[in-house]
């Protein structure tokens, strides 16, 4: 596939890989990010993106699939956060801060002690221009899996996202859908490590969804628009970084931040310019 696009656009294959990877990442981030933003779980997303680091290290050390190992740690972190919040008077944001810092510190120690080929900078900040074909295929199948799962459980995720109390009244297992979302979030986080790294993955999850939220009130429209915004900022940001020799992940995030800023002032929900004109 990449060879065809490389000949068609007269670009190196690694640039084509980066572009396709950015599109896959942008779309899947838009889908998952929409639920994260609606549920007001941006901090939880940040926590899980850091909590998977020990799983990444152990996967390398024991030669197991990184998606499997890191996702287990992501779910474990989500369970711990829920348990601490429910079984004590400690609020969820405090529990998130504790788990985030603890798991992240453990991951750094494991990486520093493990005699493996793990590059900490690569894990933290990513390098989308160095994505191999195997990871590109992995990103594609993660996207396909997320689309299938969200399509199958869309109604349940919709209801539980807007009103958990009503969800329980209808007999929905809200904990199941919460952890299903956390599992998808963990898998998406792991699959995006090589592209944008742990530090900036939360930006890919939140910025497109938050921008989309400013323009629409319907979840399906929010998901579609967030996916388009995510794919566009990924593709254009990658191109800008390639042409100007800039850090790719930072260029993608800054471009997305600019789009959000414009939307914040121009969207119908805020009507900033209209308010200024009326006053």
Each language-model region and where it sits:
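Loop-to-transmembrane alpha-helix initiation sites
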Residues: 18, 66-74, 93-97, 140, ...
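Cytosolic-side transmembrane-helix boundaries in multi-pass membrane proteins
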Residues: 246-253, 257-279
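Transmembrane alpha-helical segments in multi-pass inner-membrane proteins
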Residues: 201-250
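Short juxtamembrane and helix-loop transition motifs at transmembrane-helix boundaries
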Residues: 4-13, 27-38, 55-65, 158-166, ...
């Amino acid at each position: 596939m990449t060879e065809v696009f490389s000949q068609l656009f007269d670009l190196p294959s690694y640039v084509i890989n980066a572009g396709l990877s950015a599109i896959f990442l942008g779309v899947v981030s838009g889908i998952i990010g929409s639920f994260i933003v609606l549920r007001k779980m941006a901090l939880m997303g940040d926590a899980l993106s850091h909590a998977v680091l020990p799983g990444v290290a152990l996967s390398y050390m024991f030669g197991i699939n990184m998606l499997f190992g890191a996702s287990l740690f992501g779910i474990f972190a989500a369970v711990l956060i829920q348990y601490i919040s429910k079984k004590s008077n400690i609020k969820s944001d405090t529990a998130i801060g504790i788990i985030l810092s603890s798991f992240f510190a453990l991951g750094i120690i494991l990486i520093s002690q493990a005699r493996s080929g793990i590059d900490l900078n690569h894990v933290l900040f990513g390098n989308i221009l160095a994505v191999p074909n195997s990871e590109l295929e992995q990103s594609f199948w993660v996207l396909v899996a997320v689309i299938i799962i969200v399509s199958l459980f869309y109604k349940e995720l919709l209801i539980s996202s807007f009103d958990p109390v009503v969800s329980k009244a209808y007999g929905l297992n809200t904990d199941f859908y919460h952890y299903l979302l956390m599992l998808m979030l963990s898998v998406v986080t792991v699959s995006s490590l090589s592209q944008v790294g742990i530090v900036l993955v939360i930006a890919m999850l939140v910025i497109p969804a938050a921008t989309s939220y400013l323009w629409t009130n319907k979840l399906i429209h929010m998901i579609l628009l967030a996916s388009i915004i995510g794919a566009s900022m990924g593709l254009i940001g990658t191109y800008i970084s390639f042409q100007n020799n800039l850090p790719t992940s930072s260029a993608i995030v800054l471009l997305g931040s600019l789009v959000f800023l414009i939307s914040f002032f121009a969207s119908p929900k805020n009507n900033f310019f209209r308010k200024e004109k009326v006053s």
